[in-house]
Amino acid sequence: MNLVLDTNVLLVSFSMRSRSRWLIESFLAGRFTLSVTSEIIHEYEEKFCEHWNQLAAENVIRTILESPHTQFVNIYFKFNLLPDEDDNKFADCAISSNADYLITEDRDFTILKTISFPKVHIRTLSEFEQVLENQR
């Protein structure tokens, strides 16, 4: 299964005390492939620095970059499906990588449910947790 993770869900999944820790553990166990672009990696690093610190950001990025479950995607066309330009990189990555799901808690992404082409399937963390549970 191929996913794109919005920064907000990645941020909450890395803490050892987080209820969402299962997401990063599932990634590390190879239960899904994480599709990223250089823009997404840059945003991940920036937000981890803001919310945690530089060392934590470096460790997170290293973990993602060195994982055999990470797929790097080149974006050749920008669809601009979302009103927030910063969010479009995630939708474009999902389309270009043919992702099964874009995982986000950001309600701005719900507009994608109304767009039939290109189709981007979005799920919240709890919805995706159910998807993983049903695969066991």
Language-model-detected regions and their locations in the chain:
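Metal-dependent nucleic-acid phosphoesterase active-site entry motif
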Residues: 1-18
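PIN/NYN-family metal-dependent endoribonuclease catalytic core
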Residues: 5, 21-49
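A secondary-structure boundary/capping signal
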Residues: 6-7, 36-37, 105-106, 124
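Alpha-helix capping/helix-boundary segments
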Residues: 9-10, 40, 108-109
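Hydrophobic/aromatic ligand-binding patch that stacks against planar heteroaromatic rings
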Residues: 26, 64, 93, 114
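Extended, non-globular alpha-helical segments
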Residues: 38-65, 124, 131-136
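Active-site neighborhoods of divalent-metal-dependent phosphate/nucleic-acid chemistry enzymes
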Residues: 69-102, 107, 111
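Acidic, PIN/NYN-like endoribonuclease modules and their adjacent C-terminal/linker elements
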Residues: 81, 88, 107-136
